[in-house]
Each structure stands twice: as structure tokens, then as C-alpha cells.
């Protein structure tokens, strides 16, 4: 499993053995996901100047690489094959849910979340990548919303 403790990213087996730190870039580590093949971790990094990035680091002592810079994401998640990311911007002026294509590093806004706490909007894909779900309290109470992507992405 993977974890963030005292600002550092680490991995260990389920019984806690083999615990070790993983190489990361400088900044605050946010959400972390295993890459679908289990060989690397994808994580959200916020730099000291407020910029955010999705980065990838190999679990077995490899290099840390930039996947894409983002529009100040508060949260993100990959689709089933790791080719597209759903992101939630942390801006009150532009509270967007966006898709980020890994291959082109281009973003596409799909809707506004208007959540009072953007990090809790937590956009995630359906297993086939044809819907994005997110949470928002824009109507005064927490609710889960779904956006159908209408074939924008290939099924996974």
C-alpha cells in the first residue's frame, strides 16, 4: 500500500514490512493513486508558488517524472487505464471539473462543481470511463453528481 506521512510518500506491504520512502519532487503531496500496472504511483503535487502537477514515481527506486501541469487542482483521479485524469480546480472564481488527456496534456472543462471545499469534490470515473462522478454542496447539502461524457473518451 502507499501512504503520505510527514509530507513524504512511502510504500509498504500490507503487513507493514518493507516500508520505505519513494522519490518525489519538492512540494506538498496531495492524492496518490497506483498506476494500473502497479509499477508506479501517480500523485498530485502542489508547489510552493501554488502551481499543481500530476507526477509519477516508480516504486522500485526509479525516477520521478512530470506527467502534466494542471490548473491548480484541488483533487484528481485517473481513469481505469491511466490515460485520462479527472480533476477538480480549487479556484472559487472558476470551480471546474476538467478532463486532462495524458498523451496531449490538454484539459477540457466538463462542468462547474461549486463545492465550498473543492478538495472534497473528488471527481472519479465510472469503470468504463463514460461518466465522471463528483460531490458538491452547492445546493446547500452534500450531493453526488454525474456527468455523462457521451463518447468523448474511449471505453476502458
Please identify what each model-predicted range represents.
Residues 1-4, 21-44, 69-88, 115-132:
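Conserved beta-propeller blade repeats
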Residues 4-22, 39-41, 46-66, 84, ...:
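Beta-propeller blade-edge and WD-like acidic-aromatic loop motif
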